[in-house]
Design a protein with these regions (language model features):
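An acidic, low-aromatic, low-complexity terminal/linker signal
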Residues: 1-142
Length: 142
């Protein structure tokens, strides 16, 4: 079993590996900087607007999830609309991803079907290369 943080950006539901989530913030409390950066604790980190990243209609997001895209990578702030909570899932609960364009498939590897609410949640790959999110690559990344 593994624990995932279920989030929403626009109409898309995502699952983030909870072991790599550092913090969840309201964007009202975040000091935004220039060039897609924000202050977090005593550091300046990159931000990624997931709506923009996935080609969804651009809008004001309300939540930020501080997340490490790879085990040894610097955290980034994923900007999204809603945090739905933690889900404890067995590997057998994940379904193979349907055929989708490779531009989208590089972000996701499995899908969880929530039949009770007629919802699909896409599991964000981990590790995920920073350059896929428009972030600079670093030497210790895979």
């Amino acid at each position: 079993m593994a624990i995932y943080l279920q989030v929403r950006v626009a109409s898309v539901h995502l699952m983030l590996d909870a072991l790599h989530v550092h913090e969840i913030l309201s964007l009202d409390a975040v000091l935004s900087g220039a060039n897609d950066h924000a202050q977090w604790r005593d550091d300046v980190i990159s931000t990624v607007n997931l709506a923009r990243q996935f080609g969804l209609p651009d809008h004001n997001t309300t939540m930020g999830v501080i997340y490490s895209t790879a085990t040894d990578s610097r955290p980034v702030m994923l900007m999204l609309d809603e945090v739905l909570g933690l889900k404890d899932l067995k590997e057998t609960e994940w379904r193979a991803f349907p055929r989708i364009p490779s531009a989208s498939a590089q972000f996701f590897d499995r899908v969880w079907l929530e039949e009770a609410v007629q919802r699909q949640s896409f599991r964000l790959r981990h590790p995920l290369q920073n350059d896929l999110l428009g972030l600079p690559s670093v030497a210790n990344e895979p």
